[in-house]
């Protein structure tokens, strides 16, 4: 199982390396990886049929509940757990972003057309692009784990890999400022649903 996981992670790294030119800049690339981690948390929760609630805001449905929160926040390999470990290994003398505050901010702004991730962009406008990338990589993601609970982990490990690359190429100062946006985008996109 672990060997399959490593091979599929390698295929995902190849995909992102080959398609990196389609990302306008390095920061957007990292934030996109965060979005994919968030969406993988939702996909796992839906397919594992963990508890969830569809909430309507601004005429759209959004995905809330314990199921997605389990993969985002609570499991031993949750997105936040892995991101916190990464942050602490890279920035020992800095505090990890207040993810509870970020999560509350996201929850209170779901569906707000004027909301911007870290003041940069509206996630609703980026969602179709994130779905396209998700659909491009979904077969590889499925092969990475025979259980959906592994999907958020493999994508978070891909993000971890590219954080290492980013750190080496551009330094820690830029990366540390990206952490809140990566987390915020993951949280927001974990709530979004592909509408028919």
Predicted regions mapped to residue ranges:
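Solvent-exposed interaction surfaces and binding hotspots enriched for charged
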Residues: 1-196
């Amino acid at each position: 199982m672990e060997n399959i996981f490593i091979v599929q992670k390698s295929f995902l790294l190849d995909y992102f390396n080959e398609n990196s030119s389609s990302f306008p800049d390095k920061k957007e690339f990292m934030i996109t990886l965060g979005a994919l981690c968030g969406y993988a948390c939702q996909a796992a929760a839906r397919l594992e049929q963990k508890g969830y609630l569809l909430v309507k805001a601004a005429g759209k449905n959004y995905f809330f509940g314990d199921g997605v929160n389990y993969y985002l926040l609570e499991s031993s390999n949750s997105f936040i757990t892995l991101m916190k470990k990464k942050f602490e290994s890279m920035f020992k003398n800095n505090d990890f972003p207040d993810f509870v505050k970020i999560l509350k901010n996201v929850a209170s702004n779901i569906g707000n057309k004027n909301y911007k991730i870290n003041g940069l962009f509206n996630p609703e406008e980026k969602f179709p692009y994130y779905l396209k990338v998700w659909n491009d990589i979904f077969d590889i993601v499925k092969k990475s784990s025979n259980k959906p609970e592994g999907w958020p982990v493999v994508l978070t490990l891909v993000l971890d890999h590219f954080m290492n690359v980013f750190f080496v190429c551009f330094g820690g100062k830029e990366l540390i400022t990206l952490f809140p946006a990566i987390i915020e985008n993951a949280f927001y996109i974990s709530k979004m649903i592909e509408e028919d």
